[in-house]
């Protein structure tokens, strides 16, 4: 059984897209997919009947973006003016925010108005969430899991389709709750911190990027990251490097913990221990087996000013690294 786990966030999503397009071209068909944040869209195109859906989407995107404007200035443009049908800055919605902050009788109300927790307003059309939810929830061939974060109970929320529910390690625990994939679920999984919460939930990338533990039923996991693992970041010389550092650590810390858990399972089995999963109503307990984890990761560091900007270079790095991955595995 093969599982694919995809990290995702902002302008770094194009790497996973390049990887997925290459895997599709090579005929790789995962049984399970764990996907976080913006990589949800790449997975959506990856599973379409059109085998070139990802490439077509990004080709159109890059044509519209390659206008000679340097990345730094694009970042500033998007940060201050937003991106049509994606998000708009909340300072442009000042009159809409007035009723939520009045009557301005306390200092806190003034502070909340001038320094809101909702920096941006999501502008994705409802059809966007409907299409993804319907496509994922009705997929009978691939188990799909997306994750959000519930800020009220400090738990991961796993949105899954029926195939995932029947296959993955999804016994309810104190660490996460399991829900069926719905349009609201897709929205929650894409709810950036800067938008404010959606029904108490945020984008899952702030907690797990991606979720790996339910994939331990697989024989092999292909992990696709948005930043190089096991490599140092660029030197921290200024405040923007500090923001870059915090962003990368957000992606890495929980991931390292989950990889260590899988390594611990493998070590215990190697040392002769018999490990079994708890028995449930629809799944008799099964013995754990060694889990092979392979990583496809970028060779390019992307930083704070690339947060909103996807590039063809990063997409092509995904294509190249996936081809290298396939060649290395074929030659073993």
Model-derived regions: residue spans:
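Catalytic nucleophile serine of serine hydrolases
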Residues: 36-37
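Patatin-like phospholipase
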Residues: 1-33, 44-332
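Transmembrane-helix signature of multi-pass solute transporters
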Residues: 40-42
């Amino acid at each position: 059984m093969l599982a694919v786990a995809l990290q995702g966030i902002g302008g770094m999503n194009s790497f996973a897209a390049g990887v997925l397009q290459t895997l599709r071209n090579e005929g790789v068909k995962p049984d399970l997919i764990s996907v976080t944040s913006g990589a949800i869209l790449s997975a959506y195109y990856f599973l379409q009947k059109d085998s070139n859906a990802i490439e077509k989407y990004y080709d159109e995107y890059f044509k519209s973006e390659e206008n000679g404007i340097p990345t730094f200035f694009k970042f500033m443009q998007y940060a201050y003016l937003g991106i049509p049908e994606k998000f708009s800055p909340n300072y442009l919605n000042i009159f809409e925010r007035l009723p939520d902050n009045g009557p301005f009788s306390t200092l806190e109300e003034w502070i909340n108005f001038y320094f809101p927790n909702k920096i941006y307003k999501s502008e994705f059309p409802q059809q966007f969430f409907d299409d993804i939810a319907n496509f994922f929830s009705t997929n009978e061939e691939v188990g799909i899991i997306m994750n959000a974060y519930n800020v009220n109970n400090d738990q991961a929320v796993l949105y899954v389709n029926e195939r995932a529910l029947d296959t993955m390690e999804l016994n309810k625990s104190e660490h996460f709750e399991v829900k069926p994939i719905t349009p609201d679920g897709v929205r929650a999984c894409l709810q950036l911190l800067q938008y404010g919460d959606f029904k108490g939930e945020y984008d899952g990338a702030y907690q797990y990027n991606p979720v790996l533990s339910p994939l331990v039923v697989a024989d092999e996991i292909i992990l696709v990251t948005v930043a190089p693992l096991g490599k140092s970041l660029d030197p921290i010389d200024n405040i923007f490097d500090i923001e870059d550092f915090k962003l990368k650590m957000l992606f890495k810390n929980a991931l390292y913990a989950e990889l260590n858990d899988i390594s611990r399972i493998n070590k215990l089995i190697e040392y002769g221990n018999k490990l079994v999963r708890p028995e449930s109503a629809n799944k008799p307990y099964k013995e754990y087996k060694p889990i092979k984890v392979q990583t496809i990761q970028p060779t390019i560091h992307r930083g704070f000013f690339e947060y909103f900007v996807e590039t063809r270079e990063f997409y092509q790095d995904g294509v190249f690294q996936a081809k290298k991955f396939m060649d290395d595995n074929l030659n073993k």
